[in-house]
């Protein structure tokens, strides 16, 4: 916390994460949440929004499946998490790292790489690709969507603009993905950062 010339600035080397404390926030009268998305990718905003939406819905329904979406918060690119000053200076949850008053141990953490989006279906099981990062045949990719947790696919085929088989697809080219998985336009494609 920096105080100078009549203003106060709060700077943190950590990302605020309050998903485990939504009940306390709602009980305190909070009826709107702001996801910090400035300078973040559409993938980041989609995953974070989905996790918080599922957690808020679970407050009403008691559905415990929201916890699997919570895990995605640890898979996206993020700094060490903290609950900020909501509960004082110390850590409330050991999965959130040190308290806000301790310097962060690591830079950005990321278990998954955002690869792009599924585009228009051009024929049954064949979709245009809107890629941001490379994918290759033989690797395992995942599809996620607002109500779809994860669909793994390691048997997809990649096609060039002439529908000829290729080994890899890259950003900025007209390419297609052929799969037997039940996916749709708009699904997000991602892969683990350490390719197995």
What are these regions (language model features)?
Residues 1-196:
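Surface-exposed amphipathic alpha-helical tracts and adjacent flexible/coil segments at the periphery
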């Amino acid at each position: 916390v920096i105080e100078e010339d009549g203003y106060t600035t709060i700077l943190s080397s950590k990302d605020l994460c309050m998903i485990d404390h939504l009940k306390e926030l709602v009980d305190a009268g909070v009826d709107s949440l702001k996801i910090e998305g400035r300078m973040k990718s559409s993938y980041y905003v989609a995953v974070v929004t989905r996790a918080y939406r599922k957690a808020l819905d679970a407050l009403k329904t008691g559905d415990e499946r929201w916890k699997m979406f919570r895990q995605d918060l640890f898979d996206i690119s993020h700094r060490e998490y903290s609950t900020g000053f909501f509960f004082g200076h110390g850590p409330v949850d050991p999965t959130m790292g040190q308290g806000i008053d301790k310097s962060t141990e690591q830079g950005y953490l990321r278990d998954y790489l955002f690869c792009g989006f599924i585009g228009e279906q051009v024929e049954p099981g064949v979709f245009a690709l809107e890629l941001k990062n490379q994918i290759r045949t033989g690797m395992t990719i995942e599809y996620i969507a607002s109500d779809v947790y994860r669909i793994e696919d390691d048997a997809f085929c990649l096609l060039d603009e002439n529908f000829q088989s290729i080994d890899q697809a890259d950003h900025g080219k007209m390419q297609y993905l052929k799969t037997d998985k039940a996916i749709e336009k708009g699904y997000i494609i991602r892969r683990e950062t350490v390719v197995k």
